[in-house]
Amino acid sequence: MEGAELIIQEIHREAEQKIQYILSEAQREAEKLKEEARKRAQSQAEWILRKAKTQAEIEKQRIIANAKLEVRRKKLAVQEELIGEVLSAMREKLAALPDDEYFEALVSLTKEAIEELGTKKIVLRSNERTLKLIDSRMEEFSEKVGVEVSLGEPIECIGGVLVESPDGTVRVDNTFDARIERLESELRATVAKALFG
């Protein structure tokens, strides 16, 4: 009996060892799987975090770009409004020049046009006020500009003169409107620089 008991004990001991070995291997495998799962989870969490940071940076850049565009758009709108006000004030000031000052300006504008036309006879066109002013001082005006002057039909303008050859084939537009238009881009740059640096 004793031999059978020894065999049973030996079988128990071997079985116990196998159980311990299997449990320890299972424990080791479980730890290994747990560690791999933790690393995968950490790696995935880092990837999600990187992706979120990238998306946040892209969104931040988009918001900044949109804000800059909005600021630029508003700045241009203000600039256009102010330039419009400056041009409007200039037109009002030119339209309200006192007669004596305006007469001398008309002489100067006409002489400038005569140089371009190179003719001894001219036809002047302008608004009603200008034509009446020149007509009331025609002898003085003709003498100052040095050519024969006749008056044409009135035109829509704030002032200045449209000077034509007698046959109307050549003309120099020295109305205030045309001169402002010719100077407008330069004036815009000057006003923009003065207002916005």
Curated annotation (Swiss-Prot):
- Entry keyword set: ATP synthesis, Cell membrane, Hydrogen ion transport, Ion transport, Membrane, Transport
> Main localisation, per the record?
membrane
How the protein sits in the membrane?
Answer: Peripheral membrane protein
Localization in the cell: Cell membrane
Q: What are its GO cellular component terms?
A: plasma membrane; proton-transporting two-sector ATPase complex, catalytic domain
Q: Name one GO molecular function term.
A: proton-transporting ATP synthase activity, rotational mechanism
Family stated for the protein in its record: Belongs to the V-ATPase E subunit family.
Q: What NCBIfam families does its record include? A: PRK03963.1
Name recorded for this polypeptide: A-type ATP synthase subunit E
Give the originating organism. Thermococcus gammatolerans (strain DSM 15229 / JCM 11827 / EJ3)
